[in-house]
Amino acid sequence: MNITTIGRGVIGGGLARRWERAGHKVTLLGRDGGDASDADVVLVAVPSGSISVALDKVTGLEGKIAVDATNAYAGRDEQYESLAHEVKAHTRGPVAKAFNANAGVLYDRIGDQRVAPGCLYAADDEAQVVTRKLIRDAGYEPENVGGLESARALEDFVPGVFSKLTLAPAFYRFAAPGQL
């Protein structure tokens, strides 16, 4: 799969390395933007206050599947239901909210775990299959919390829960008894 990441930092760069190891072709774009025409899917991994600015500098986004990994730490544009909906307004394609509840500083330690850690995600129907594949190819187990209408709850969950954890950054996994 051809993946373009918009953002080359801890999240964008870290996921790019994991996906390249899984056999994907990854193009990393930074602040200057670029072209995503060849991408099958686009990862948005920029500060939340920079989503529109970053996406305005990228051509070839129209109709692409986009995975939004942003969190609202840098604020949000309240004209959108969620940050994922802000991404959707720019790409006009299927969108998933994923990887925003996973600590990028731990990407290199995923393989050391006894079981695959979880990755919460919310996605449009048309983005479900690709999103689950990218989550698994990054080393996580997908944990679906619903359609894109659930993206705001997932965005609000992260600062509300993870900022309170004394063990953060941490892996997590939701499983029924006996599954771990």
Model segments located where?
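Short, structured coil segments at secondary-structure junctions
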Residues: 61-62, 91, 138
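Rossmann-like NAD(P)-binding element
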Residues: 33-65, 69-74
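Active-site-lining helix/loop region of Rossmann-like oxidoreductase modules
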Residues: 117-180
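NAD(P)+-binding Rossmann beta1-loop-alpha1 motif at the extreme N-terminus of oxidoreductases
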Residues: 1-34, 38
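Hydrophobic Val/Ile/Leu positions in short beta-strands of Rossmann-like dinucleotide-binding domains
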Residues: 3-5, 44, 121
